């Protein structure tokens, strides 16, 4: 509950909403090798990590629908393809729905309420912009709340079409691409994320869609514990073997690493560095470990993995070495349980968050016998700020509440 209230408080702090992103100034990278900004300990020791456990929320979480067991054919995901948000075009399944099919469709009141927040807020902003009046924080907050709740609405593909939500001039693209209103950067990011989800006909509101949930050990009935796993039948699975942002948005959030793998943000269910030999690293995750990373937001000092061969680094470490030579940026995800030196203002409240692209500016070998490398990562300019505070904070209060409900339901799985 404390984390949900804290996130809600952070999301409502700003009464003055900036209409364009505060882009961090370019950081001059350093040549190899590079040293950390503080003395390193002779032996690695885990840093003290703030507790990530949360009590059962008191606030109502009834808005989070139950996990879908089956989907009707008309609401099945078409494929894992995703749109070009710079030139959005409604998907075929959306365009193929005829008006006559929508006439008798009844949209549930709870769904209508939150979708109307998005559209009413957009209409108010557009009316003001046409009168050369700058929309205020309350106008944007209405849209913000509507979008955040929309991720968890139990709706259908027909409802998305009936409400014109993928239309370029009336739907979500009007926020991130086409409209006369200069919306805040974080609204554009979240509208684009929701658009990508719905464009693929992914209407499942569950955080754990496409995941087979493991079950706790129950000695009374003789059942061993099982772990979560990817559902091989899930059509929306994306893969993370690419450089750059791809379909991912700044601040996109997942409750677990497996969910990030499902959506193609990362490629390994356990490892922190993902890549390909001879090509480089695609993504790296700041999580727990024996070596405390150093996190300054725009700059990170990130440890590679220990090698059993004193003459050669691990494959994961070698991937990042290759990035330092090719200058291919790496996707960086931060986990709530990451191990860092000192206090960390960039840690998500729960789960893991995508924080954009970083260049591997340099590295040095900290332990030759174990081939432990320390990499200097520098966040690329012209990206939105890291979403750790303010109205743009991720995870959102809705995401935290949905995660709490999922944990409660999982605890009582038969």
Range-by-range predicted roles:
Residues 1-99, 399-414:
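Ser/Thr-rich, low-complexity intrinsically disordered regulatory regions
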Residues 66-353:
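Acidic, glycine-rich low-complexity segments with interspersed aromatic residues
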Residues 343-413:
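Compact mixed alphabeta submodule
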